[in-house]
From Swiss-Prot:
It comes from the Archaea. This is Large ribosomal subunit protein eL19. The keyword Ribonucleoprotein applies. One of its GO terms (biological process) is translation. It comes from Haloarcula marismortui (strain ATCC 43049 / DSM 3752 / JCM 8966 / VKM B-1809). Binds to the 23S rRNA. Located at the polypeptide exit tunnel on the outside of the subunit. GO terms for cellular component: cytosolic large ribosomal subunit. Keywords: Ribonucleoprotein, Ribosomal protein, RNA-binding, rRNA-binding. Residues 45-130 are annotated as: Disordered. SMART domains: Ribosomal_L19e. The keyword rRNA-binding applies. GO terms for molecular function: large ribosomal subunit rRNA binding; structural constituent of ribosome. Residues 58-85 have a biased composition (Basic residues).
Length: 149
């Protein structure tokens, strides 16, 4: 067996890959052994006698499976958590989404005539002050206190 380490080094440089990624066609070993210049190696690369193997990457298959399960709420228990609650769910973003939903609901009720503009303003201010935990809580309050409206 011929020592092709010099050719492998040249080929790695020509192909701009590491030596381990250089592939020699076993049927063309004689031609490869005769290649002593970079130009010779370039010609063999063009002919396909020398090629660069594909780079190996990390499979995302397991990560995709885990993502799919988490979309259903699985694998999210206490044993899977690393950060604090505030790092996993930003409290400001949580507040923003809740208050936007409540204000949208209030606007709908005002526009369809269920609430007068003064009731709307009163409830809007209460919502902004954090009186209601959710849209459902807001609706319960409206039913209890503005049921006649």
């Amino acid at each position: 067996m011929t020592d092709l380490s010099a050719q492998k080094r040249l080929a790695a440089d020509v192909l701009d890959v590491g030596k381990n990624r250089v592939w020699f066609n076993p049927e063309r070993q004689g031609d490869i052994a005769d290649a002593i210049t970079r130009e010779d190696v370039r010609e063999l690369v063009d002919e396909g006698a020398i090629q660069a193997k594909d780079k190996k990457g990390n499979s995302r298959g397991r990560a995709r499976e885990r993502q799919k399960k988490r979309a259903y709420g699985h694998q999210k228990g206490a044993g899977s958590r690393k950060g604090k609650a505030g790092a996993r769910q930003n409290s400001k973003e949580d507040w923003e989404s809740r208050i936007r939903a409540q204000r949208t609901k209030l606007r709908e009720l005002r526009d369809e005539g269920t609430l007068s503009s003064s009731q709307y303003r009163d409830l809007y201010d209460k919502a902004g002050g954090g009186e209601f935990d959710s849209v459902a809580d807001l609706e319960r309050y409206i039913d209890a206190n503005h049921g006649d409206a």
